Amino acid sequence: MSLAGIRVLELAAVGSGEGRPSTASGIAVAWVAKLFGDLGADVIRVESADGDDRVRSRPHELHRWLTTNKRSIRHRLDEPIDALLGDADLVVHDGSWPELAPELVTAAWPGLVALAVTPFGQTGPYHDYAAEELSVIHGSSWGFLSPSAATDIALPPLKAAGHHATINVATAAAAAAAAAVDHATRTGQGEHIDFSMYAAAAKLTEFAPAAASFLGVDASRLGTKTVVPWGIFECADGLVSIICPEQEQWESLVELMGNPEWASLDAVATQPARRENADLVGIYLGEWLATQSVDELAVQAQHARVCITPVTTMAQLDANDHLNARGFFATAPDGTRQLGPGYKLDQPWWALGSAAPALGEHDGETWHPRADLPGHGLDGERPSARKTGQASRPLEGVRVCDFTWIWAGPFATQYLAHLGAEVIKIESPERPCLFRRFPFHPPGLEDHIDGSGSFQIYNTDKLSLGVNVRDPRGREIIE
C-alpha cells in the first residue's frame, strides 16, 4: 500500500539514556525509516547537531543509500522533540531516548507507534550489552553455522561482509511497525514495539532450533550437509550454486547430465547414499560442471526443474539483463544509481523522490500537511483511541491463502499470522511440503507427517487445507 500521509520520525541521533547504542542499531533504524520513505511516508531524520552519525560515518557513502526519501534536521540533547512526536505516526529509535520509555509514550501519545530497535531488546540480562553486527551474527548462532559443511574444526566461524543480519532483521521490524501503524490509524491505539535484533536473527537460523528442540542435537557447520548435492561448483566460465533436496530433482539432474554411468551406482542412488558418499558425488559432478557454461546450464536446469543458479559477481549484477528489464536499478535525483525494491507493484508507490539530504538541510521544518502529500494520503489527524475490553492484534480480520512451501514463503506468512492474520495453508495431499517429510522427529515419536520440526518452526499459527488443485473441484474450492 502507499504510505503517503504517514509521518515517520527517525531518531538517528543518540539520546541521553544509559543504553549502549551501536552502529548496527543505527543502520537498522535508518533502514526501517527508508522502507517507509520509499513507499511515500513523510520521514524526518533527527541527527546529532555535532555530525556524529552512525550511518554517515560508514564507508562507501552508505548514507547516500540509507537516507534517500528523508529530510534532515539537527538536534541538541537539551532540545525537546515533543512537537515532532506529537504529530508523528511512528517513531523509530535505538533505545537510548529516556522520553520514549513505554509508559511515558502511552501516557503522552497514546496513538503513537514507537519502535525500539536494539541488539538484545530492552529487557532481560543482556539488554544493556554493547553489540554490533558481529555480535548479532554469532550470538544468534547464525555465525556458528557458517560456512556450512566446513571440514577443519580449527578454522573459526565466518560472517558475510557488511550488514546482512542488520538489514534482514530490520526488514522484519519494519513489517511489524507497518502493521501497528495501520492498526493505529484505524483505532487510535498506538503500540510500543521492543524489537530484539538478536532474537530476530535466531529466528532465521532455519534447522538449528528444530535440531536442538526436536532431536536434542546441536547443529554445527562441520561435517556433511543433510542434502547432497548442495554447494557451489566451478563451471567453464564461472560459478553455480546447486541443490537437489528431492529424489526426482536428482533424477532430473542425472538426465540433464546425459545419464552418466557413475550415476547408476548404488553409492549415489538415494539421498542417504549420496550423503554417505558426498565426496564421490562432488568429484563426479564437479568434472561435468567444469565443462558447462553458466548461462546455458542455468536455462537448461530451469527447463529440467533442477535448482541450479549462477553465482553472480557485483559487475555481473549491475549488467544483469533480468534486473535491468524489471527496472530494479533506480536513479536518485542527485544522479546516483541505486538499488531499487525487490518487488513490483501495480501502483507506482515506490519511488526515489529525494536524494540523501545534507546534514541539517531541513532545519526548522516540520511535518508536511497530510493532504498535501502525493498519493492516497490520510485526511485529518490521527483518530482518538477507542477503548476496548481486549487488545487486538494488528492484522486481525485479514485472511491469507498460503500457497507457499519450504522456507521463505512459510516464514513470511507465519509472520502475518503472528500479527493476527488468519492464514490458511493450501497443501497437496499427493505431494506434501518437503519440510513435512524431513526426518526431524523427536526420539520416541513415530515418523509422522505432522511431527517434523522443520515444518513446525515455520508453520505455527496457521490452518491447513488439503486440496488437489489438479481436480476441477479442488480449484473451485480455492476460487
Predicted regions and their residues:
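N-terminal helix-loop segment corresponding to the beta1-alpha1 unit
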Residues: 1-186, 362-479
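Short, well-ordered beta-strand elements within core beta-sheets of diverse protein domains
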Residues: 9-12, 238-245, 282-292, 308-311, ...
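Aromatic-enriched alpha-helical interface/lid elements that frame and gate functional surfaces
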Residues: 90, 215, 228-304, 308
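Glycine-rich beta-alpha junction loops
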Residues: 119-121, 197-203, 237, 245-248, ...
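Short Gly/Pro-enriched turn/cap motifs at secondary-structure boundaries
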Residues: 220-225, 230-231, 333-336, 356-359, ...
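A glycine-rich dinucleotide-binding beta-alpha-beta segment and adjacent secondary-structure elements
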Residues: 303-353
